[in-house]
């Protein structure tokens, strides 16, 4: 092998290995982990990779002579899968250095200590690894290889073994950290280094747990009989860092709160499957507080025994298959994003709620005793509150929310710049009511007695610093030197503002609406600001996330707020010749400008007690534009009455009068688009979210959770995944590429008025949808007359179909279905008693014809209708009798629902997918049985309970008995 990157031939052969691996029947026989660079996680015994010489912990630098050192693990995995026959890897091998141990054993320590060394130039690496000063503890992330004369070489995936207890002479090492199952390489194990390194605290102190009112039961000492109760803490073996490295002594990590006394406990081994991301369980900020054996409800009557590990910031659900060995069941639940429902004091059940795919899911757990439930709930509620106080409330902006929906703090007359802010209290009240749209108060420890009253304002600052924060939705004070480049996009909230003492002010109460003032939105937070919650936004974040000051808002101007749940009417913002505004899809187009109707202005004046702000307010002109699919108006519709800054109230009334005559047809089928933006449906409005576009602009894009399907990454088997697959970590990178357009789509209301202007001929309407053809004036007139005479009926029908995209769809959960299929099922509408039977089981729901239709309509709102479609396709497949038709239908079902990157791919694990693929070699009626059972179980555990709680189902079981038809 020649030289690589300046190393001599000897060093190159020691450190770099070029390995050719041929594909076997089960893939290449190894798994990978980590990002930038990617490392070999495990090598199958006897597989192609092991025969070729690949070893665990090898760092992949090149794949087929392409540099991949900075690739992500998912990207490299897809690239390896796409290689048909063989791959050529250039790897950097960790070469052990032999060093005598304390008792004559051999301690092998990796010469390349960290990812920091791997990213440095090879010549620097060689120097640093052999002769340089020892690397700082915070740079040591690599795995150490420890060899003892009796125990042999130990090598684990994410384990950090080291030399422990040199002074005391301890050299006890755990068994080889590989799963005991001989054929399953998809597990890695995190084992404690020393059997005495975990402690059990079995009981809470009786005088520390608050007793519930009305209960006479005292907290009894429950000493863990039958392994039901385990309150644990981990002794952290660390010295300046969170790994098992270079620790000469053991020191315990004292918890923040005491749940009981210390009792020794045999160590437990946590087994992480490959689909679960391993955790740094030795992080000094992460303390194991509690371990309890509970019952987890997997169905209505099906339970399983699980072991819950409660850390200071997350929960781990595990199952103890063997004594002392816990398999992790799923990804961890972080306490800052979960909620606890304790239920009644007599019931032993309690629930843990979390968000998945923007929908609320829950785990139902059952304790073995009241004491155990009280202990677990006390620990969880205490730490959930602690973590959520540190976390900023997430910002969720909807598709049709407008600038007027921002929370604004009203200013009070007589308040000057010298007004003082109330100091927030440090003791939160448990029963405090939070403002709408927020899960936590923005202040650190607010109390209800010190919230800002209605009408009290924060003093305007002449020159606010970029790191200052304002309460959610409040206008920023005017700045002395505003610049157009400081403008931020509409539709994002402001983070809470901190005063000079470092505490945040509480948000203002809800107040009446003022839709003529645009508020200053909040810039998107960078990962640095989202992870470091305690530091102000100005620190540790990129310059683009700093909060600039807003311009164009006088300090003494009255501003009010509107509750976004009550009304989302898009504001009509006047426009001057010197300023061009960016609009949301529900706002007015550049060709139709006007102020609010007089009725809305009158209501606003009455409710707020102040006259509305003048419509001549000028807003800045340099906001980035949304990128929206273009539906342009033809030039024939741009014949306005001259360019003017804003239309008068009389013009608005005249246009309203025109609409009154034209709106009769729209009222026939309850699909009027006048109030298109007034609806607050979370499912509809959350389909689109804003994201960074090219050249600093902002674009509308489909939410990541809707575009992505979950894939099992169990092994590197050959699957034809498309090169454009976007993983969880790389999905956002594909949105900001390409050129952007600066044209903004008009609102449906504006479009309706625009199409009705200037006569509103059918030809004008058809040109809008069929495109503009440039012709001379004479030819255009002749074609107009001819087309009107020949195709008026066809065009009218076509127009009605195409204009339907701008009408409000009647998709609310409690509304009556409107499609043809739903109309045919109206005659089968069940009674309340029949609908109540659907709650007994999912089978009874699917056997009922109307129930099947209703459940399918509900799944469409949940964006998971492919699960039911797959189940129904499998049922139809079992009814096919012809073998040839059965083979064709089986391939169609596999390609449509099971194949990776299929158009309606269902969520199956890799084993089920491979098993179904093998069944297609010899097609029978039961070749989809396993996949069908998995999807049925998924619907039964996930979608079916949500359906029973939905408004659609509740309306059916609570429907009033109608009088019989005549």
Swiss-Prot record:
GO terms for molecular function: GTPase activator activity. Residues 18-95 form the PDZ domain. InterPro entries: PDZ, PDZ_sf, PH-like_dom_sf, RGS, RGS_RGS3, RGS_sf, RGS_subdom1/3, RGS_subdomain_2. CDD domains: PDZ_RGS3-like, RGS_RGS3. The modification Phosphoserine is found at residues 712, 715, 747, 776. Residues 527-548, 576-594 have a biased composition (Polar residues). GO terms for biological process: G protein-coupled receptor signaling pathway; negative regulation of signal transduction. The modification Omega-N-methylarginine is found at residue 167. Residues 115-135, 403-618, 637-704, 806-830 are annotated as: Disordered. Detected in embryos from E8.5-16.5 in cortical ventricular zone, dorsal root ganglia and cerebellar primordia. Isoform 3 is detected in testis and in spermatocytes from newborn mice. Levels increase and reach a maximum after 21 days; after this they decrease again. Long isoforms are widely expressed. Phosphorylated by cyclic GMP-dependent protein kinase. ISGylated. It is found in: Cytoplasm; Cell membrane. The keyword Disulfide bond does not apply. Its main location: cytoplasm. It holds the Pfam family PDZ. Residues 841-966 form the RGS domain. It is a peripheral membrane protein. One of its GO terms (cellular component) is cytoplasm. Residues 649-675 have a biased composition (Acidic residues). Keywords: Cell membrane, Cytoplasm, Membrane, Methylation, Nucleus, Phosphoprotein, Signal transduction inhibitor, Ubl conjugation. Residues 676-686, 820-830 have a biased composition (Basic and acidic residues). Down-regulates signaling from heterotrimeric G-proteins by increasing the GTPase activity of the alpha subunits, thereby driving them into their inactive GDP-bound form. Down-regulates G-protein-mediated release of inositol phosphates and activation of MAP kinases. Binds the GNB1-GNG2 heterodimer. Binds EFNB1 and EFNB2. This is Regulator of G-protein signaling 3. The gene is Rgs3.
């Amino acid at each position: 092998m020649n030289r690589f990157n300046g190393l001599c031939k000897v060093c190159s052969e020691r450190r770099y290995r070029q390995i050719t691996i041929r594909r076997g029947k089960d893939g290449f026989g190894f798994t990978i982990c980590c990002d930038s660079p990617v490392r070999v996680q495990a090598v199958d015994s006897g597989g192609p990779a092991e025969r070729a010489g690949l070893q665990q912990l090898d760092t992949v630098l090149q794949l087929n002579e392409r540099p991949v050192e900075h690739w992500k693990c998912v990207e490299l995995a897809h690239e390896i899968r796409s290689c048909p026959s063989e791959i050529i890897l250039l790897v950097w091998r960790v070469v052990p250095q032999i060093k005598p141990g304390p008792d004559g054993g051999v301690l092998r320590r990796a010469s390349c200590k960290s990812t920091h060394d791997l990213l440095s130039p090879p010549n620097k690496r060689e120097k640093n690894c052999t002769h340089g000063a020892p690397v700082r503890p915070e740079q040591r992330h690599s795995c150490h290889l420890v060899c003892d004369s009796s125990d042999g070489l130990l090598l684990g995936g994410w384990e950090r073994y080291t030399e422990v207890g040199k002074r005391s002479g301890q050299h006890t090492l755990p068994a080889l950290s590989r799963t005991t199952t001989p054929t399953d390489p998809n597990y890695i194990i995190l084992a404690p280094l020393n059997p005495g390194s975990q402690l059990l605290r079995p009981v809470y102190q009786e005088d520390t747990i608050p007793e519930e009112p009305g209960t006479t039961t005292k907290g009894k000492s429950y000493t863990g009989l039958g392994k039901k109760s385990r309150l644990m803490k981990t002794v952290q073996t660390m010295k300046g860092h969170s790994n098992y490295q270079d620790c000469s002594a053991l020191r315990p990590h004292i918890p923040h709160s005491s749940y009981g006394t210390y009792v020794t406990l045999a160590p437990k081994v946590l087994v992480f499957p490959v689909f679960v991301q391993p955790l740094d369980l030795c992080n000094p900020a992460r303390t194991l507080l509690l371990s309890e054996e509970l019952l987890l409800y997997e169905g209505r009557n099906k339970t399983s025994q699980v072991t819950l590990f409660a850390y200071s910031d997350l929960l781990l659900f595990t199952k103890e298959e063997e004594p002392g060995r816990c398999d992790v069941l799923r990804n961890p639940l972080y306490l800052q994003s979960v909620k606890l429902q304790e239920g009644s004091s007599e019931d032993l059940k309690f629930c843990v709620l979390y968000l998945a795919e923007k929908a609320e899911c829950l785990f139902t757990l059952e304790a073995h005793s009241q004491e155990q439930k009280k202990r677990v709930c006390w620990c969880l509620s205490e730490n959930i509150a602690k973590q959520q106080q540190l976390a900023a409330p997430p910002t969720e902006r909807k598709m049709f929310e407008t600038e007027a929906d921002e929370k604004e703090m009203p200013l009070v007359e007589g308040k000057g710049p010298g007004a003082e802010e109330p100091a927030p209290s440090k003791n939160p009240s448990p029963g405090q009511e939070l403002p709408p749209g927020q899960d936590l108060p923005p202040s650190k420890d607010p109390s209800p007695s010190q919230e800002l009253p209605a009408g009290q304002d924060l003093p305007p600052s002449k020159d606010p610093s970029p790191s200052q924060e304002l309460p959610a939705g409040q206008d920023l004070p005017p700045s002395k030197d505003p610049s157009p480049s400081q403008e931020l996009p509409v539709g994002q909230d402001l983070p809470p503002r901190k005063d000079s003492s470092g505490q945040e002010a509480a948000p203002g109460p809800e107040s009446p609406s003022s839709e003529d003032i645009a508020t200053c939105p909040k810039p998107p937070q960078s990962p640095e600001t989202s992870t470091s919650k305690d530091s102000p936004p100005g620190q540790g974040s990129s310059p683009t996330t700093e909060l600039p000051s807003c311009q164009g808002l006088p300090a003494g101007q009255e501003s009010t707020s509107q509750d976004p749940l009550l009304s989302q009417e898009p504001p009509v913002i006047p426009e001057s010749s010197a300023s061009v505004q960016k609009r949301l899809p529900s706002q007015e187009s550049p060709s139709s400008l006007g102020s609010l109707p007089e009725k809305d202005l009158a209501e606003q004046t009455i409710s707020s007690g102040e006259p509305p702000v003048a419509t001549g307010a000028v807003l800045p002109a340099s906001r980035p534009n949304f990128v929206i699919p273009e539906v342009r108006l033809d030039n024939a519709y741009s014949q306005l009455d001259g360019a003017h800054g804003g239309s008068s109230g009389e013009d608005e009334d005249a246009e309203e009068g025109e609409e009154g005559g034209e709106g009769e047809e729209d009222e026939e089928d309850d699909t009027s688009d006048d109030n298109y933006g007034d609806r607050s449906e979370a499912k509809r409005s959350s389909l689109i979210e804003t994201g960074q576009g090219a050249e600093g602009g902002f674009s509308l894009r489909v939410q990541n959770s809707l575009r992505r399907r979950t894939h099992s990454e169990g092994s590197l088997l050959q699957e034809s995944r498309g090169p454009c697959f976007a993983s969880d970590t790389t999905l956002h990178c594909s949105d900001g590429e390409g050129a952007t357009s600066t044209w903004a789509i008009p609102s449906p209301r504006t479009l309706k008025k625009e199409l009705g202007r200037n006569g509103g001929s059918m030809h004008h309407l058809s040109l809008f949808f069929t495109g503009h053809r440039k012709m001379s004036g004479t030819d255009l007139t002749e074609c107009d007359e001819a087309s009107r005479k020949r195709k008026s009926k066809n065009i009218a029908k076509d127009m009605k179909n195409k204009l339907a995209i701008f009408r409000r769809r009647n998709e609310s959960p409690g509304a009556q279905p409107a499609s043809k299929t739903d109309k045919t099922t109206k005659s089968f509408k069940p009674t309340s008693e029949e609908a109540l039977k659907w709650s007994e089981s999912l089978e009874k729901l699917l056997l009922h014809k109307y129930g099947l239709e209703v459940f399918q309509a509900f799944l469409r709102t949940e964006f998971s209708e492919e699960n039911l479609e797959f189940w129904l396709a499998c049922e139809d497949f079992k009814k096919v009798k012809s073998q040839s038709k059965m083979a064709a239908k089986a391939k169609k079902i596999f390609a449509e629902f099971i194949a990776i990157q299929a158009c309606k791919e269902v969520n199956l694990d890799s084993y089920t997918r491979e098993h179904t693929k093998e069944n297609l070699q010899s097609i029978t009626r039961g070749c989809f049985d396993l996949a069908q059972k998995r999807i049925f179980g998924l619907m039964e555990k996930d979608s079916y309970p949500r359906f029973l709680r939905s408004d659609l189902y509740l309306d059916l079981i609570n429907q009033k008995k109608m009088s019989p038809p005549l």
